[in-house]
């Protein structure tokens, strides 16, 4: 049994290291569940209750709850890749183990922050949107692009915006410390994806500069729509080229277009 088969959140965290180590020993691809086990209600984001502002403890706890859900899925997606791609380069898999364990540490930080504010994990529903963006038919380059370059890359943009929104909020220091530490360490996670995407492309004699936009075009219909402005500085630190940043900016505008068109008609 792997960590994504376990429902209780703290048990998931306790088993992630051993799950990753077991996955490293696989010689054949393992099977991941359609959805990971959960001890909380899972609903589509449109069905979630409205959120309170960051000026309240509840609003801050809800934000950490949402962030915990993202870190939880990031942790499980790392394990999923280890389970489903046993033939990936050894260096990639060993480094991914460390990244995945680090995601579990981020999750624990969020859960402890929620409790410090007087709330509990499961007090609000969660979604499985990040997990559902991946598919059993993915190849290793698809998976790296989806998880480490798109989802986690978008998280850098959102995290920076979140840090600025927390400025001036009562009790901000503890919350900001958590968000800042996570966002700083996520730069390394995204850079991990950037480096290995290019290295694996080169090992397969694929031109990564042309593969990036082509592969993104083929995957974009199942990606969650990220609308935060692209943080160019953080993206560069995480290994994105200028052409890749421009692509992300244009993709964001495409995602925003229906909203902008509706506003023009109003």
Feature map (PLM): residue ranges:
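Non-heme di-metal
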Residues: 1-266
